[in-house]
Amino acid sequence: MANIKSALKRIEIAERNRLQNKSYKSAIKTLMKKTFQSVEAYASDPNPEKLDTINTSMAAAFSKIDKAVKCKVIHKNNAARKKARLAKALQSALPAA
């Protein structure tokens, strides 16, 4: 354990940031799961209300992912990969037109 005052402070800051980052990442995972579940529900029974639910949950997930990049919680390439997975899931559920 550190004895220097500045080192002790850095330990506290690192722990605080770790918990905030963990919260952000958990929220992103939850929103992604919710979006994937909405897409599966739409694929089994397509109707406009379920499509609205997908769009709402996808917008929330994209927003949270972008905010995480802005706060440097996740890397921009990681965010791009997550957003691409969500978009690909939606495209696979939509009928080819």
From Swiss-Prot:
One GO term of the biological process aspect: translation
Gene Ontology cellular component terms for the protein in this record: cytosol; small ribosomal subunit
InterPro entries, per the entry: Ribosomal_bS20 (IPR002583), Ribosomal_bS20_sf (IPR036510)
TM stretches of this protein: none
One term of GO molecular function: small ribosomal subunit rRNA binding
Pfam families per record: Ribosomal_S20p (PF01649)
Top-level taxon of origin: Bacteria
Species annotation: Synechocystis sp. (strain ATCC 27184 / PCC 6803 / Kazusa)
Task of the protein: Binds directly to 16S ribosomal RNA.
Name used for this protein in its record: Small ribosomal subunit protein bS20
Keywords, sorted A to Z: Ribonucleoprotein, Ribosomal protein, RNA-binding, rRNA-binding
Family of this protein: Belongs to the bacterial ribosomal protein bS20 family.
